[in-house]
């Protein structure tokens, strides 16, 4: 038995300089696990609750001492003496102790920190890498990265409405080559933007945040950068968008303020369809707002056969929301963010449900990240084949890419890079 003898949380800072929770778990054998919890900027209304202090005299109210206290008090008392290898038992005990449907009492940031740190300690106890401990012997698929190289929306101080413009190096033979290709395009894009007189400051996720007039202009710059780096757009590298459309959905309309457009759901679907005709876009995340089920139905009918339609705010990594989407036949992919649901067990349940229904899944970071690279291991553990973890700058993003490179090296000849086969179209 891998007995839990100590759990300790502290308040640390994330990549935006905001407080977050870090948790240490110690087992009786001396095995140890540590996990830091990420935080989002564009958060879905149906996400599990991130507990903040609200004390305006500390961190402008964003402190997490209440969550830290929950870990060091109630959660430690409840879990002390339990077997760290029984992940389901641990996670259910915390869910029951919290007693709310969205983890609002103790905080998803408190519960998730403990959940992930327990898994890491158990992996060390078993003398297994985390991806192997979570996923078992069949964990061997390295994910295609979605690299966010132009930032807009809530992730940047510019007029671009669409939040993320991403590249996916699908022709790479390995994940190490995919990272190299992404870095080459990133630097080519920097030169293209600079030559055109744009700033090359970066946003929250490490992508550039130039003052461009439209999504079309951003995509045109990216295609030029792909070509300048020596690759073919649509063959070597395909494009992906995260519209984060809940952020510009107002009174039943999609208000693209940067482009001066106000569209209904049908107009928004036509907007995406036109972009997909002009550019090799094979994935669109949150193309419609989180509760615009009718809009999602239109989008799925129009583009679902040839484009991956990813539900982030729509599903919030919640098996109940995902089950509703599957019943209604909307979207065809789920974005997986561990802090949206708040435990490792529920995260894995959502991925399994998606795969059984024929949906793809994409492991994802948040805009507020740390050096913690756990999601890289979870991506390999679940064989999900795709990961979203930012651009090719900022060490909080690169920590995940570097971990994937290490995992690929460790797996050796059994490692398989997912490549283009993971996508529709």
Curated annotation (Swiss-Prot):
Enzyme Commission (EC) number: 4.2.1.11
Organismal lineage: Bacteria, Pseudomonadati, Pseudomonadota, Alphaproteobacteria, Rhodospirillales
Signal peptide: none
GO BP, one annotated term: glycolytic process
Transmembrane stretches, start-end: none
Cofactor, free-text remark: Binds a second Mg(2+) ion via substrate during catalysis.
Co-factor(s): Mg(2+)
Residues binding (2R)-2-phosphoglycerate, per UniProt: 163, 337, 366-367, 388
Protein name as it appears in the record: Enolase
Chief location bin: cytoplasm
Record-linked InterPro entries: Enolase, Enolase-like_C_sf, Enolase-like_N, Enolase_C, Enolase_CS, Enolase_N
NCBIfam families membership: eno
KW Transmembrane helix (keyword) present: no
Record function comment: Catalyzes the reversible conversion of 2-phosphoglycerate (2-PG) into phosphoenolpyruvate (PEP). It is essential for the degradation of carbohydrates via glycolysis.
